[in-house]
């Protein structure tokens, strides 16, 4: 695979290999055949980051080869959304001959939605001034004249200039209902929107007929919490990053959801609060004891759950675990399988043509 060529003819074979590999890894814990969710074979990534290489009068996007560290010129990127590809061409054309916009520009980040909105961030090794803002506004207007629904942001050390706004609103059809998700620049969002829809619908399916409330640790912009709210009496979710909490609160209002409560705190602090070890001012007005959380949802980083969180989740009758690293999932299952058994197993092909696998398991108490 090269950045400008995807081996689409090999899609089925690479997916089949992942299914076999996941089944083998999960064999000590389950004999289930994974439910398999396919990605689009191209234009599946909704975000991408590129370094910018200056070559005389020319400049262009590059990425670095992971093995050799050599730079690779990238003029098109079929893994990314069609909108990102349009913007890559338009941004280079708009910046190449503009001394103020191109000087000390070292990176461009793209974030797009299925609803065809985009935020483009230009990263600089220099101070950004009013002259930069004027030129950036002219570029933004020129891009919009090409029917590109784009917002521009300039970034430098300790500086962020958002010309209009630093977010876009995604609209996803989830099990017959359109969900609105505000996505903030430089915050985590699911990279493969088509796969995100399938993950959310799978999570809805496995939690059908749930009793009681749902607890989610590290909910981000509320991606899972809000979609799953229809299956539970109430949802209690924690998140530590302020921009994500603000986006989640917006998403709750935009989707007219009245049974989700977001708390800004770390999982460890939440555990202390739940167990009555410590009191927190930010929990005033929230009666934790009134929640009957029968299900806990976790979507940890690549490192998986730490041992304290492992112990915490074992206290819940049902654990819904989305993993971006099956190796650490299996490590966690060595502990979790002592008290819980795997009821459902899914493979989500979030990153086609790479070694990476995303998977989901539903665990129920033995």
From Swiss-Prot:
GO biological process: tRNA methylation
Entry keyword annotation includes Transferase: yes
InterPro entries the UniProt entry points to: MeTrfase_TrmA_AS, MeTrfase_TrmA_CS, SAM-dependent_MTases_sf, TrmA_MeTrfase, U5_MeTrfase_fam
Name of the top EC class for this enzyme: transferase
Disulfide bonds: none
Active-site residue list: 324, 358
UniProt catalytic activity: uridine(54) in tRNA + S-adenosyl-L-methionine = 5-methyluridine(54) in tRNA + S-adenosyl-L-homocysteine + H(+); uridine(341) in tmRNA + S-adenosyl-L-methionine = 5-methyluridine(341) in tmRNA + S-adenosyl-L-homocysteine + H(+)
A family per Pfam: tRNA_U5-meth_tr
EC number(s) from the headed UniProt entry: 2.1.1.-, 2.1.1.35
Sorted UniProt keywords: Methyltransferase, S-adenosyl-L-methionine, Transferase, tRNA processing
Keyword Cell membrane listed: no
Residues reported in the UniProt entry to bind S-adenosyl-L-methionine: 190, 218, 223, 239, 299
GO cellular component, one term: cytosol
Domain of life: Bacteria
UniProt family annotation: Belongs to the class I-like SAM-binding methyltransferase superfamily. RNA M5U methyltransferase family. TrmA subfamily.
HAMAP family tied to this protein: RNA_methyltr_TrmA
Name recorded for this polypeptide: tRNA/tmRNA (uracil-C(5))-methyltransferase
Species this protein is from: Escherichia coli O1:K1 / APEC
Organismal lineage: Bacteria, Pseudomonadati, Pseudomonadota, Gammaproteobacteria, Enterobacterales
